[in-house]
Amino acid sequence: MFANLKYVSLGILVFQTTSLVLTMRYSRTLKEEGPRYLSSTAVVVAELLKIMACILLVYKDSKCSLRALNRVLHDEILNKPMETLKLAIPSGIYTLQNNLLYVALSNLDAATYQVTYQLKILTTALFSVSMLSKKLGVYQWLSLVILMTGVAFVQWPSDSQLDSKELSAGSQFVGLMAVLTACFSSGFAGVYFEKILKETKQSVWIRNIQLGFFGSIFGLMGVYIYDGELVSKNGFFQGYNRLTWIVVVLQALGGLVIAAVIKYADNILKGFATSLSIILSTLISYFWLQDFVPTSVFFLGAILVITATFLYGYDPKPAGNPTKA
């Protein structure tokens, strides 16, 4: 049963990661009449959906009792304001990160984005060393060097990109800066969140509700500051269609899927899922979206990144001493 849950959770992770990247890219580049949906509002809606999903999970853990659910939410959130406030910092950073991903996929093809975004492994590792005093082994440090080399190859401009007039250097640079900033914020927020989880006994679902609460507030502030005029003119849900809602739901489920993978799987299998997602994104970008032509340099970089992903999660087991009779 446990093995089935492990592979089911990994399968869902591959589907969620690949689908989110591709549908988000498609929704941001699709030419359509009327105003395009605002990414800032999509981030807010995704946070609200995540809160609802986590409340349902807490309700399930409370043996489907509304009274027990109300008591848990009251005791763990309202009666512990300082614990709740701890989530304000990572929540604000996650909100920024989610907005940056829309910017990145508006300017980069899905395959390049997927591979470059794996730099979050590097930032997470560095923040883990500095904030959690985590010790990295030889394989981990080697994987980080391979990772940086692979991403550099992926970002290496090809002749077709240099000659292309459709995709300006400016938009490529904006996309790259958005991904790099998202990697940095993902690493810091992820380690900060892990530190909080290890220091307290609150469930991951309660913590996600707290994250979603602050995320909604920060997200609404972003809507007001950057898109307030457009919202007042065309409405909060302007440009929303079936594809937009698919993107929003997939983004809302992301954190929950990761939580399930952490619970049922390990780093090596998670690395396999990430690698498979990169391969699928590359194939679909080439054959379906037709906005990406892979080069030999890209393939070399992608192979290095996939290798680094596996190597970072590799945990060599020391040879056990044979037991004496």
From Swiss-Prot:
The chain crosses the membrane at residues 8-24, 42-58, 138-154, 173-189, 209-225, 246-262, 268-284, 295-311. InterPro entries: Nuc_sug_transpt. Keywords: Antiport, Autism spectrum disorder, Disease variant, Epilepsy, Golgi apparatus, Intellectual disability, Membrane, Sugar transport, Transmembrane, Transmembrane helix, Transport. It catalyses: UMP(out) + UDP-N-acetyl-alpha-D-glucosamine(in) = UMP(in) + UDP-N-acetyl-alpha-D-glucosamine(out). GO terms for biological process: transmembrane transport; UDP-N-acetylglucosamine metabolic process; UDP-N-acetylglucosamine transmembrane transport. Coiled coil: none annotated. It is a multi-pass membrane protein. It is found in: Golgi apparatus membrane. Its main location: Golgi. GO terms for cellular component: Golgi apparatus; Golgi membrane. O-Glcnacylation regulates the stability of SLC35A3 and the specific complex formation with MGAT4B. GO terms for molecular function: antiporter activity; UDP-galactose transmembrane transporter activity; UDP-N-acetylglucosamine transmembrane transporter activity. It is linked to Arthrogryposis, impaired intellectual development, and seizures: A disease characterized by arthrogryposis, intellectual disability, autism spectrum disorder, and epilepsy. Additional features include limb malformations, distal joint involvement, microcephaly, retromicrognathia, and general muscle hypotonia. PANTHER family: NUCLEOTIDE-SUGAR TRANSMEMBRANE TRANSPORTER. Transports diphosphate-N-acetylglucosamine (UDP-GlcNAc) from the cytosol into the lumen of the Golgi apparatus, functioning as an antiporter that exchanges UDP-N-acetyl-alpha-D-glucosamine for UMP. May supply UDP-GlcNAc as substrate for Golgi-resident glycosyltransferases that generate highly branched, multiantennary complex N-glycans and keratan sulfate. However, the exact role of SLC35A3 still needs to be elucidated, it could be a member of a catalytically more efficient multiprotein complex rather than function independently as a single transporter. Belongs to the nucleotide-sugar transporter family. SLC35A subfamily. Interacts with SLC35A2; the interaction is reduced in the presence of SLC35A4. Found in a complex with SLC35A2 and SLC35A4. Interacts with MGAT4B. This is UDP-N-acetylglucosamine transporter. It comes from Homo sapiens. The gene is SLC35A3.
